[in-house]
Amino acid sequence: MSRIGKQKISVPQNVKLIKSEENNFIVVEGPKGKLEKKFSMKIKVRIENGEILVERVDDSKEARALHGLSRTLINNMIIGVTEGFSKVLEIKGVGYRAAKSGNKLILNLGFAVPVEMFDTDKIKIAVDGDKIIVSGIDKEAVGQYAANIRAKKPPEPYKGKGIRYLGEKVRRKVGKTGKK
């Protein structure tokens, strides 16, 4: 039995949960928005007296793998519609800047042309000095968008210039020693 999968999920009062039996489709609605996800038929979700219990239909390898994952995904949906998720990135480097213009994030990263990224309906972007704050209700979408921003200019190991997550430690390398 999965240690994570067998834990119950408590549903807050302000969250509405709708479950479809025939195709294992779950809709979670809360104060921040609405999320929906389809789960495997090898997983059974039960809702009883304000708690969600995730069980597997059989003991196959696939069902065991999906058990803990499904429970965590449902928990993340509930946290997302009540509190939301956010990731903070910081820009290091001379002349590296980020600006927000409408629904567009403009990154000046030392390339010939500024890099432009567009907001989606699930994601909100805020720029505060050298920090970029990515927030939204879908944890997967927030993490992916933040990873896409970081991929535009990952931190390099010699000077540490680039885009990194807040608090991320960049392993530094020693440069050339030169001729003696």
Residue ranges and their predicted role:
Residues S2-H67, R71-A146, A151, E156-K180:
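N-terminal intrinsically disordered, cationic/polar leader segments
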